[in-house]
Regions:
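A short, compositionally biased
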Residues: 43, 117, 145-149, 232, ...
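ATP-dependent small-molecule kinase catalytic core of the GHMP/sugar-kinase superfamily
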Residues: 137-167
Length: 283
């Protein structure tokens, strides 16, 4: 059995283009199967509080994650799952074949609004992003990125985002973690400000050229795992708030942005006290 699993793992770690596309097809089929499951879960939704009153989890989150875990065990037994609603202490996200999942990104939106939430799922092979998905379930829109193949919205190729100045762009950030001076400077420099409250959906607006940047000062690995590959394929910038690479297995303060406003946003964030990492966030 160990030899068999190791053989599967070796084959998947060395995926060629056709094999990666086959894996993508299997994952898309699994994601679309949620269309029959999620309405029933929402109809009987139970909510619990985790770290604070804004940090919620529901049976919807847990069931989606459990079903994907079962899918991996059945079809890709050598793959590991690194996910929000489980203990990840024994998972080495940087080696082998690892899926990173946020079963519901924007749980508070699901609970309070029944919209503006998504599923984030990404596949890393030996620490390299290979496949990425953001499923905007309420709008039945599946965004995906395939390494070296591009990014797609419901299988239609997404164009790379043109470089634009900060003055032309809407910025997305949580005002509760920025001091008043920083907020004022960002608002003065940008065209406007918005916040959806789901990291995946706020990031999608950047990917589609609707926002200039999305800033999150407390991102977990599952909040941002898909964004790495989307940023690569769409010619965007994704760094920490010191303009350095992000450790995908750790997370932390991050920005995904249009190349034309990346440095301008970071300059403002790092002046006058800037952001405060440890404040409770209402997102």
């Amino acid at each position: 059995m160990k030899t068999y699993i190791r053989k599967i793992k070796d084959e998947v770690c060395n995926l060629n283009s056709n094999q990666l596309l086959q894996l993508d097809q299997a994952i898309r089929h699994w994601l679309k199967g949620l269309d029959d499951i999620i309405p029933k879960l929402i109809a009987d939704m139970h909510t619990e509080t985790k770290a604070n009153q804004f940090d919620l989890v529901t049976n919807v989150d847990q069931m989606i994650q459990d079903q994907f875990d079962a899918f991996l065990k059945e079809h890709y037994p050598s793959h590991e799952l690194f996910a929000e609603e489980k203990n990840n202490d024994l998972v080495d996200a940087k080696h082998g074949d690892v899926w990173i999942m946020d079963p519901i990104d924007g749980t508070a939106n699901l609970v309070k609004q029944k919209t503006d939430y998504c599923i984030i799922l990404s596949y890393f092979s030996e620490g390299q992003p290979m496949l990425a998905y953001i499923y905007d379930y309420p709008h039945h829109t599946l965004y995906k990125a395939i390494r070296d193949e591009g990014a797609f919205e419901n299988e239609v190729r997404m164009p790379k985002v043109p470089s634009l100045d900060i003055s032309e762009m809407i910025l997305s950030y949580n005002p509760y973690v920025l001091n008043e001076h920083t907020q004022a400077d960002l608002k003065a420099a940008a065209f406007s400000y918005r916040l959806i409250g789901a990291c995946g959906l706020d990031s999608l607006r950047v990917m589609k050229g609707q926002f200039g940047a999305h800033i999150n000062t407390n991102a977990k690995p599952w909040d941002i795992s898909a964004q790495f590959l989307f940023a690569k394929e769409l010619d965007l910038k994704m760094t920490n708030l010191d303009n350095e690479p992000i450790d995908f297995a750790v997370g932390g303060p991050f920005i995904i942005s249009n190349k034309g406003c990346h440095e301008a946003v970071l300059e403002i964030l790092n002046q006058k006290g800037g952001y405060q990492v440890n404040k409770i966030t209402k997102t």
